[in-house]
Amino acid sequence: FADSSGQLHAYNKSNGVFYRTKVENVCSKRDLYEVQYSDIEADSDDKYYARNLIETKLSESESQISVSYSRLLQCCKDAALEGDAFRRGRQAVCKLASNLIVRHPATMLADRNRAREGSSMLLEDVVLTEEEKALLDWSGWNGDHKALAELSAVATMFFSEDGSIPVNRIRETFLEKHFSILEAPIGSGFVTTSMSMFIIGSEDDSYDFDFAYMPLSSKYAALFTSDSSLEPFYRLDLPHIELMNCLHLLNCEHWDVALSRENGPLEHAIRDWAKTASN
């Protein structure tokens, strides 16, 4: 979404301010995936267990996704919607979508808290070998069962290959859906948000859904639907891209910042969203 200078236009929902910023400054929150020790001094420099471990592994995963993701965008540009590059790109988008869902703070908080609260019960019957104790001591756990349980929960949420883990079930659900590409018209572009998708038709006790929408770049967006009759590619006109941008803001429950490559589409989307939401 950024321009050639690495910047984009943004709108902060909480204060209603439009601004221009660099990509790395958008939606940045320090220590989002860090696990804090249970007993620490307020001014301690060593607050976190296995600091940067999760962030490093996430960066490695994102680097792998980005290669296929970039090739997918090139396939869209070339109208090459078949073949291995497009298939791998679609898989990368599904993996990214599932990761974004489970990594959102609103999703993580309950699981992390449950892990801490249940740490004593989970570990009371565990007998560690001397090698395991040595490994934990090397990791710097400091005998903190709550921190260990929370780190384990976060690592499982993000990186486990178990098919029953939510991130993998969500990815499989996306992969099963019919996939369509939307192209923005010249002179306009897609708007995205800090939670860069919306989903319709999902139930609390099910991983299935009817419809999901995810902007991929300022030029392209993806649809995931249960309707296999839809075409694989749609070139939108101006009214329809303005509609999709507004629908994104209206239907995405957890967004704090809206973003676009150019200022015009963003301002128009915010204006439409504010007007519709107030009715």
For each predicted feature, which ranges?
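Alpha-helical structural context detector biased toward long hydrophobic helices
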Residues: 2-279
